[in-house]
Amino acid sequence: MRPITILCTLATLSTTLAVPFSQASKSTSASRSTSSSTVPASLPSPTLSGPNACPPNKFKQCCTTLSQVGDDLLKPLGAVVPLVGAIQVNSLVGVSCRPMADAAPESTCGNAVMCCDSSTVGGDDLMQTSCQDFALAKKREREAIERQQRRFSEYQRMMLSQSATPAPTSTGVDVMGSSFSKAKATPTRV
């Protein structure tokens, strides 16, 4: 193989492995082993965490981000070289984070409020990469709960439509050779 081909292949491979992706998995086989008289019980609706609290398994922290550090470094240089002042650094890596109470409003943090994984809370790491911006974490939490509620309502609708369809009647042959039916008339409300 040519060296350029190997280099391009390795670069593509490393890029595809570095970028996380989510794949929606759809199951094509549906289980119909449930009885038609079974009506699904209602599940408890998931609740959002408090307005100032991070989603479950995340902890609220006040962090200095790399974008704030970059702005602090580039703004003074921008006064001398205007082109440098136009550079913007965006990062969600937390630097020197300190824990915050869930009830504490965002205004008490002079830096960026972030929701960090439990594994990073109280760690001695200078940089915490498993943090998420507070507003983004709350938005994703709301979207996840809405998705779960839509799926559950679709499941309920499917189960109710299956229970409304009549079951097939069984017919047989009597001992004397005459046919009979075990079908019963039942009122159905729609």
Curated annotation (Swiss-Prot):
Q: Does the keyword Oxidoreductase apply?
A: no
* Keywords associated with the record: Cell wall, Disulfide bond, Secreted, Signal
Q: Where is the signal peptide?
A: 1-18
Give any GO molecular function from the UniProt entry: structural constituent of cell wall
State how it assembles. Answer: Self-assembles to form functional amyloid fibrils called rodlets. Self-assembly into fibrillar rodlets occurs spontaneously at hydrophobic:hydrophilic interfaces and the rodlets further associate laterally to form amphipathic monolayers.
Q: Which family does it belong to?
A: Belongs to the fungal hydrophobin family.
**Physiological role:** Aerial growth, conidiation, and dispersal of filamentous fungi in the environment rely upon a capability of their secreting small amphipathic proteins called hydrophobins (HPBs) with low sequence identity. Class I can self-assemble into an outermost layer of rodlet bundles on aerial cell surfaces, conferring cellular hydrophobicity that supports fungal growth, development and dispersal; whereas Class II form highly ordered films at water-air interfaces through intermolecular interactions but contribute nothing to the rodlet structure.
> What is the designated name of this protein?
Class III hydrophobin F
From which source organism is this entry?
Aspergillus fumigatus (strain ATCC MYA-4609 / CBS 101355 / FGSC A1100 / Af293)
The record lists the lineage as: Eukaryota, Fungi, Dikarya, Ascomycota, Pezizomycotina
